[in-house]
């Protein structure tokens, strides 16, 4: 039911920090353009080989906050955003001249893996105060959280329904993300502008690069996002997602009577169900 309380939670946490965090006069929010697709669905396989990905210019100007603050990201990076009637798609081509050194550890959802990682932040309210964060590492480990009060508050207990697929190849690695419209909150305007930010971590270099770039000396998060333009006719989401699951379990115990056919030493159980979020 966490998705249902998202609007209330974000409004509450917005009051935890000063209403206005000073923004550097040098900061000008860059524009990211997206387009609507729909003739053929995006296949979430982590390969970015659908022609639709070429419909938009990639974001490439990520700059380091560590270790060389302000320098261009050391490995070329291209990020694109598409959307359709059901979801927002983020595709990232993360080039690496030494793909064999890409760090990709497995872990549970929301765990810190100390791996390479790609992250997208979205301020779908475009209030410059609140955002949602989606991250994935090359092994496909996902993370997500709410961001409030312009970066003063975060909540990892938020677990929306979304998907990600990754691939490591001779050029580096790719991340393909699908975020259902139902998991985001936005206005009813026909045409919209959202806030967006991209982040790449190259773990072996202790490197973190951002778009848009914000110096470490400046506070704030959503107030420093770029502007995502091109969104139109999103409609009113139904705020409902069903996530099927299956469970299996096996037991072994010492029976009281080994000859009793109705009391076997082993037993197996299976069940299934749906996680409902609205």
Tell where the protein language model's regions lie, with residue ranges.
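Structural preference for beta-rich elements and adjacent junctions enriched in aromatics
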Residues: 2, 11-278
């Amino acid at each position: 039911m966490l998705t249902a309380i998202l609007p209330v939670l974000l409004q509450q946490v917005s009051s935890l920090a000063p209403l206005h965090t000073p923004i550097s006069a040098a900061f000008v929010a860059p524009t990211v353009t997206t387009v609507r697709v729909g003739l053929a669905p995006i296949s979430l396989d982590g390969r970015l080989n659908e022609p639709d990905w070429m419909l938009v210019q990639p974001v490439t100007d990520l700059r380091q906050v560590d270790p060389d603050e302000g320098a261009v990201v050391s490995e070329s990076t291209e990020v694109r955003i598409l959307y359709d009637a059901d979801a927002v798609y983020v595709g990232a081509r993360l080039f690496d001249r030494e793909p064999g050194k890409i760090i990709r550890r497995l872990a549970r959802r929301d765990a810190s893996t100390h791996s390479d990682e790609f992250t997208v932040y979205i301020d779908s309210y475009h209030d410059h105060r609140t955002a949602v964060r989606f991250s994935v590492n090359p092994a496909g480990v996902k993370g997500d959280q709410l961001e409030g009060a312009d970066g003063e508050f975060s909540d990892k207990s938020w677990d929306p329904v979304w998907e990600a697929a990754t691939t490591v190849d001779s050029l580096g690695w790719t991340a393909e993300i699908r975020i259902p419209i139902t998991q985001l909150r936005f206005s009813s305007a026909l045409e919209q502008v959202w806030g967006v930010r991209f982040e790449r971590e190259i773990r072996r270099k202790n490197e973190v690069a951002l778009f848009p770039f914000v110096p470490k000396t400046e506070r704030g998060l959503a107030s420093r996002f770029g502007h995502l333009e091109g969104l139109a006719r999103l409609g009113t989401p139904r705020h409902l997602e069903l996530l099927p699951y299956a469970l299996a379990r096996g037991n072994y115990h010492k029976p009281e009577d080994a000859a009793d056919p109705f009391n076997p030493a082993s037993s197996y159980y299976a069940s299934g169900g749906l996680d409902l979020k609205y």
